[in-house]
C-alpha cells in the first residue's frame, strides 16, 4: 500500500511543480510521514525531505526547459536571489539534521490555501505594465533578493518546502514578473536549490540513499513526468486558464495537507 502513496505523492508534487513551481516537499513530506510507516521514527521527516528534494531536481528541470522554450523565464533579475537561496539552502539542510524530526510548518500550508483562493477570485494576474524580461536589477530588487532569499533558502534546506511558493509571490508581486515568467524563473532556481539541498541531506545522512534508493527512483520518475505534462499545459493556455487551474490545485492541495498534518496526525 505504501507504494501507492509514493506514486500519489510524487504525482501531486509533479503537477504542482510544473503548473506553479510548487516545491515537491510541500506535497510529499506530509503524505510520506503520515501515510507511510517506513518514514516514521527519529529521521523519518529528514528522509522524506531528502526524497522530495531529489524528486524536485528533474521535475523542476523539465519544467524550466518547457518555460524557457516559450521564453517565460527571466534570469537577469533572478540570478542574485538564486545565488543567495543556494547558499542558505545548504546551511538549512545542516540545521535540519541537527534539530532532528521536523514536520512541515503550518504557515506554508495556510499560505498555499490563501494563494489558491486568490487565483480563484482573480485568475488573470497579468499587469497592465509588466516589467519586461531581461530588465537589469534595480536597488529595490537587490534589497528584496537579500531580504527574501535568505529566509527562502534556509527554509527550503530546513524543511524542503515553501521555496517555490514563496518565490512565486516574490517574483510576481515584488519583481513585477508575469505569472508564467515568475513560475519559469522559480522552477529554474528550484532546480539548483533542490540539487544542493538534496545532496546536502544525503551527504550528511548517507543511509538515506541506501535505505530509500528505490523509493527515491520511483518518485523521481513519476514527479518528472507529471511536471513535464503540467508545464506543457500551462504554456499552451492563456493566463486566465492557468490562474484558475492554479487556484484549484493550490486550494485542494493546501486543504488536503492541512488535514493530513493536523487531523490525521
Write out the residue ranges for each language-model feature:
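Small-residue-rich hydrophobic segments that form or flank transmembrane alpha-helices
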Residues: 3-85, 89, 93, 146-153, ...
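Membrane-water interface at loop-to-transmembrane-helix junctions
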Residues: 135-151
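Residues that define the loop-to-transmembrane-helix transition and helix capping
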Residues: 46, 76, 102-105, 180, ...
Amino acid at each position: 500500500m505504501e507504494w501507492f502513496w509514493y506514486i500519489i505523492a510524487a504525482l501531486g508534487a509533479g503537477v504542482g511543480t510544473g503548473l506553479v513551481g510548487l516545491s515537491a516537499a510541500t506535497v510529499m513530506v506530509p503524505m510520506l510521514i503520515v501515510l507511510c510507516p517506513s518514514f516514521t521514527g527519529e529521521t523519518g521527516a529528514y528522509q522524506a525531505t531528502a526524497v522530495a528534494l531529489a524528486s524536485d531536481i528533474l521535475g523542476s528541470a523539465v519544467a524550466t526547459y518547457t518555460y524557457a522554450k516559450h521564453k517565460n523565464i527571466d534570469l537577469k533579475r533572478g540570478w542574485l536571489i538564486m545565488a543567495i537561496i543556494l547558499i542558505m539552502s545548504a546551511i538549512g539542510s545542516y540545521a535540519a539534521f541537527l534539530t532532528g524530526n521536523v514536520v512541515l510548518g503550518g504557515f506554508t500550508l495556510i499560505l498555499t490555501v490563501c494563494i489558491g483562493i486568490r487565483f480563484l477570485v482573480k485568475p488573470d494576474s497579468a499587469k497592465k505594465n509588466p516589467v519586461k524580461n531581461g530588465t537589469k536589477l534595480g536597488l529595490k530588487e537587490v534589497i528584496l533578493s537579500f531580504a527574501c532569499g535568505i529566509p527562502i533558502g534556509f527554509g527550503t534546506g530546513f524543511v524542503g518546502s515553501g521555496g517555490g511558493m514563496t518565490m512565486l509571490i516574490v517574483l510576481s508581486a515584488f519583481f513585477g514578473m508575469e505569472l508564467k515568467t515568475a513560475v519559469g524563473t522559480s522552477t529554474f532556481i528550484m532546480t539548483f536549490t533542490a540539487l544542493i539541498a538534496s545532496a546536502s541531506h544525503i551527504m550528511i545522512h548517507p543511509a538515506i540513499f541506501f535505505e530509500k534508493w528505490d523509493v527515491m527512483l520511483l518518485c523521481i520518475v513519476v514527479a518528472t513526468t507529471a511536471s513535464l505534462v503540467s508545464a506543457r499545459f500551462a504554456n499552451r493556455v492563456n493566463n486566465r486558464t492557468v490562474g484558475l487551474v492554479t487556484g484549484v490545485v493550490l486550494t485542494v492541495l493546501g486543504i488536503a495537507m492541512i488535514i493530513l498534518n493536523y487531523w490525521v496526525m
